[in-house]
Amino acid sequence: MAVDDVLKTAAARGRQMGLPYGGALTPAEAHEVWRNAPGAKLVDVRTRAEWDYVGRIPGAVEIEIVTYPGGRPNPGFMAELESKVDKAAPVLFICRSGGRSHNAAMLAAQAGYTAYNVLEGFEGDRDAGGHRNTVGGWRAAGLPWSQS
């Protein structure tokens, strides 16, 4: 599917969900847009601990939206975003399962970015056994990631 078609689908999904930003992408759609839309950035808003111990997406911009430990909002989030990401290009936000990235997309949209949330996040929802990484998410979709 062409990038424009993917973004139209994401925008329609976002309207259906009542989202106050550009739209919502599946992990596979996000990967397609990130790789093929000029200037698009994937911003991983998980914590440093998650990047270090759970895994990273090679080439993603990493900006914590909450700090670890403590889980407090990162007061420098928007300043860091503005220093690393051009407002003229699509910005795709991802976290563990979609909640923090939704908040990041809302903040970015308020600041003038064309923002999208990556549904399911990096790890996806829990399966019947209570484990992540098997039901939805970037990793379960077989998209690029690494672990230290």
Question: Which residue ranges define each predicted feature?
Answer:
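Short, surface-exposed ligand- or partner-binding patches at beta-edge/loop junctions that are enriched
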Residues: F93-I94
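Rhodanese-like catalytic fold shared by cysteine-dependent sulfurtransferases
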Residues: M1-G39, R48-P90, S101-S148
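Structural scaffold elements adjacent to functional motifs in cytosolic proteins
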Residues: L42-D44
